[in-house]
Amino acid sequence: MKGHPKGLISAALSNMGERFGYYIMNAVLTLFLCSKFGLSDETGGLIYSFFYAGIYILSLVGGIIADRTQNYKGTIQKGLIIMALGYVVLSVPILATPENKAWLLPLTCFALFMIAFGNGLFKGNLQAIVGQMYDNFEADAAKQGPEALKEAQGKRDSGFQIFYVFINIGGLVAPFVAPLLRSWWLKVNGFIYNSQLPRLCHEFINNGTTSQNFLDEAAKAGADPAVLTQGGEAIGQFCTNYLDVFNAGIHYSFIASVVAMMISLVIFLANKKKFPTPTKKAASANAGYTAEEKASMAKEIKQRMYALFAVLGVVIFFWLAFHQNGQSLSLFARDFVNTDKIAPEIWQAVNPFFVIVLTPIIMWIFGALGKRGKQISTPRKIAYGMGIAATAYLFLAIFSGVMGYPSATDFRGMEVAQQATMKAGPWVLIATYFFLTVAELFISPLGLSFVSKVAPKHLLGLCQGLWLGATAVGNLFLWIGPLMYNKMPLWACWSVFLCMCLLAMGVMLGMVKWLEKVTK
């Protein structure tokens, strides 16, 4: 934490508040869409994919707006306000019925668009400001001599790792909020949380038929046995009441997201004057160059942008595999993991927990290698991260093959007793998230650092937006995960992601020497 720009922690705290609010919603989004509107896993996954992609695509728009207006701080401020308004819309508990679904689902999607657009204005531009902090930090160090400059340049990667840890502190706590509020509200109304029951309730409302599986799960959730024996209208009323209470508890959790946005806004406004303005610095730096120097700089800028786009093309495959934590991996936790007393959303807290614990260890390892003259370049670290991500899916593929897991659709067609004998222990998820988190720490914060190194000074917001845009492209195809999860044996599903990560690693390793040359 020592020897970094003074504004780093303030920016990280503002980002932490925003991420806390976001991860409250993100932890339950796919399951919420399915439980509220009775959507299939594939349809819920498709909405999630477009929302998640929108967050990062709109970061590109936010970067362009900030670069054009030269108003990074104002753009960030507006983003926080728009996100808060989106969460306000989501927090209103309206029971979804066949009559109002035609306008309620689009309203929910509009609220998600507001959150995505606000995030686009906020996310990349705050990262651009952090990058400018280190540009200024290195410029000041250069005035003190080569040794001071070398030491300052070595701080950038670790600075972005610190920034990343604060993001995940919010992500660690947030996944507990919605499940706790939902379970509390169910208990207040005489019900018990049951992850399978919302889907079964929607099936009854739509088809009017019951199964032994439905009756068993309804009894576990606190349904009156007399109601279950009456059938027809009585069971329909139970289903409506359970869905209403179940989803209202999630709606109330979005109020916490609104509060988190307001706290983030207060932190940002309190420290606004301390943050640098990237475009103004770039304009003053370019004022004294000759025509020849500007031509040479233009050639270098082209090389840097080529390098940036090359890395962006590779990391698309990583984000497609990694962000299955909100898609097929959450569904896997719900269906194939024995989590009777733990909501499946809670497992998303495992990743930020590992980020917080492992980041200091990885920073120490990189620092120790640097002191011995064996420093690993940022592009090579990213390539290694791809290989580590492949290890996570190799583990899942082997485990699923050994267990003989069918597709999720076939699994749900089995008797409850047979399902119970096939369910895995929680350690499977913990091991998977461990490998994915180590991979993330080799790629995400170091990718931000890489972008800040190669980005032209007058395009900082745009380039950070491009990095997030690559994430968006990967997120656009997240729906592939639930599709394969429901249609293919699980070993085959995980093997697809394994091959993606291995391919990305191979391509990245093939470009390492060129990328190292460009970044130097």
Predicted features by range, described:
Residues 27, 60-61, 92, 169-184, ...:
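A gly/Pro-rich, aromatic-decorated transmembrane alpha-helix motif that marks the paired
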Residues 2-36, 113, 302-328, 349, ...:
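Pair of pore-lining "gating" transmembrane helices in MFS-fold secondary transporters
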Residues 68-83, 368-387:
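Cytoplasmic membrane-interface "Motif A"-like loop-to-helix N-cap segments
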Residues 16, 86, 100-125, 312, ...:
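Hydrophobic core of transmembrane alpha-helices in multi-pass small-molecule transporters
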